[in-house]
Design a protein with these regions (language model features):
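Context-dependent free N-terminus signature
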Residues: 2-3
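Eukaryotic helix-linker segments that join adjacent hydrophobic helices
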Residues: 6-76
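EF-hand and EF-hand-like helix-loop-helix modules
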Residues: 25, 39-43, 53-58, 69-74, ...
Length: 175
């Protein structure tokens, strides 16, 4: 403990972002039709600031050649300015790929996993440590069960309002 600066400091610039910048970033990700695993070059397409991309890449990818776009986008959505409702709306819209105002259970499960991993990674200062902690504690399985119990395994019509209620019931730390 105390042997160095946490890598989560690499994400500090995002705490200065306004909510509109986050929503614009999320929309750009969709408009560019980028993959879920981003190379450093693809991440530069999104963020444009090469110094920030290097920090983000170091935090999320470590020694890997790609980073999880969804984990990065969820982290940015959580760290940037805005109210709890604005954060929820940003997260929901990030996973509403068809732009119909609804997500399905599978998308909600992935979103929740990404959000929990983002929280843990920032707290632990390391994505790999967060992944290990999640595996050890069967977090992904618990999230899947929670979502499926609420919406059913084939839930297709989860609206923003349903999502907000779900977050308050299950994950009210966004409040």
């Amino acid at each position: 403990m105390g042997k160095g600066i946490s890598k989560s400091a690499h994400l500090a610039p995002f705490t200065e972002w306004e909510r509109k910048a986050v929503d614009d970033l999320l929309q750009k990700y969709k408009d560019e039709d980028l993959p879920f695993g981003l190379s450093e070059k693809q991440a530069t397409t999104l963020l444009t600031d090469e110094a920030l991309v290097k920090k983000v890449f170091e935090f999320f990818a470590g020694g890997d050649k790609t980073l999880s776009a969804l984990e990065m986008l969820c982290s940015v959505a959580l760290l940037a300015g805005g109210s709890a409702d604005e954060r929820k709306a940003s997260l929901f819209n990030a996973f509403d790929f068809n732009k119909v105002g609804k997500v399905c259970s599978a998308e909600l499960i992935i979103m929740c996993i990404c959000v929990v991993k983002a929280y843990m990674a920032v707290l632990l200062g390391d994505v790999k440590a967060a992944e290990e902690a999640m595996v050890t504690k069967d977090v992904e399985q618990a999230i899947e069960e929670t979502v499926n119990n609420k919406f059913g395994a084939d839930g297709e019509d989860i609206t923003l309002e349903s999502f907000k209620e779900f977050v308050v019931e299950e994950f009210d730390t966004l409040e």
